[in-house]
């Protein structure tokens, strides 16, 4: 079915169409792949390739994304199975809400440390290199390269170790982010920092989850 056909079904029978989409693997796998890709991008490209050290809130955000990956994969096993679908929904909601919470905190810290007014740092809690994950999961010990914070919150500019020789491509990216004093979606204009980009990703997922879950609930109520 093409996009026009899907749009027609959504307009004529929105609830049934949304429920039918949930019973297919595509949406669940799309969520898992999207969040997994963001984790890999943050780790492999920005952390390893560009030497942007992750902070405490950054690894918490990775945890939230990882929860959503697991939820999407569980639901994708059989989206028509109510138990598996419910587990996927709960994990997706939990991950997106938790991700928004950590992203908001990181955004507040980012604005405080980049504010020329020293009073803006008053009351701002600093970052720890010894993270405490939900349920006391020892992720920093299990996978330190992925979940061990080594940077400071709010400061995400590349820090290249002494003696490292960068390729021309690495040098271009590193200089761009160093000049902008951190990660931005559009570095020259300081448009959308990393925390705000994560807020957008989690927020979009949460809105879609609310819509999908609402349609599922209406379908159950109607019988």
Curated annotation (Swiss-Prot):
Residues 1-25, 79-81, 219-223 are cytoplasmic. It is a multi-pass membrane protein. One of its GO terms (cellular component) is plasma membrane. GO terms for molecular function: protein-disulfide reductase activity. The chain crosses the membrane at residues 26-46, 58-78, 82-102, 198-218. Induction: Expressed from a tri-cistronic operon that encodes AssT, DsbI and DsbL. InterPro entries: DiS_bond_form_DsbB/BdbC, DiS_OxRdtase_Dsbl, DsbB, DsbB-like_sf. Disulfide bonds join 55-58, 127-153. It is found in: Cell inner membrane. Belongs to the DsbB family. DsbI subfamily. Required for disulfide bond formation in some proteins. Part of a redox system composed of DsbI and DsbL that mediates formation of an essential disulfide bond in AssT. NCBIfam families: PRK04307.1 (NF003304). This is Protein-disulfide oxidoreductase DsbI.
């Amino acid at each position: 079915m093409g996009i026009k056909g899907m749009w027609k079904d959504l307009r004529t029978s929105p609830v049934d169409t949304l429920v039918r989409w949930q019973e297919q693997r595509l949406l669940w796998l799309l969520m898992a792949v999207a969040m997994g890709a963001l984790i890999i991008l943050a780790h492999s490209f920005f952390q390893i390739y560009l030497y942007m050290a992750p902070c405490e809130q950054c690894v918490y955000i990775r945890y939230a994304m990882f929860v959503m990956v697991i939820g999407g994969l569980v639901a994708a096993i059989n989206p028509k199975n109510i138990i598996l679908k419910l587990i996927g929904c709960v994990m997706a909601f939990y991950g997106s809400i938790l991700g928004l919470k950590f992203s908001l905190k990181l955004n507040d810290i980012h604005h405080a440390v980049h504010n020329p007014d020293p009073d803006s740092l008053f009351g701002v809690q600093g970052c720890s290199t010894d993270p405490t994950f939900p349920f006391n999961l020892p992720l920093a010990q299990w996978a330190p390269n992925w979940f061990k914070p080594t940077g400071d919150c709010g400061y995400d500019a590349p820090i290249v170790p002494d003696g490292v020789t960068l390729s021309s491509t690495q040098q271009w990216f590193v200089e761009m982010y160093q000049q902008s004093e951190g990660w931005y979606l559009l570095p020259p204009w300081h448009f959308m920092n990393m925390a705000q980009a994560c807020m957008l990703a989690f927020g979009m997922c949460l809105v879609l989850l609310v819509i999908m879950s609402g349609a599922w609930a209406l379908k159950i109520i109607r019988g």
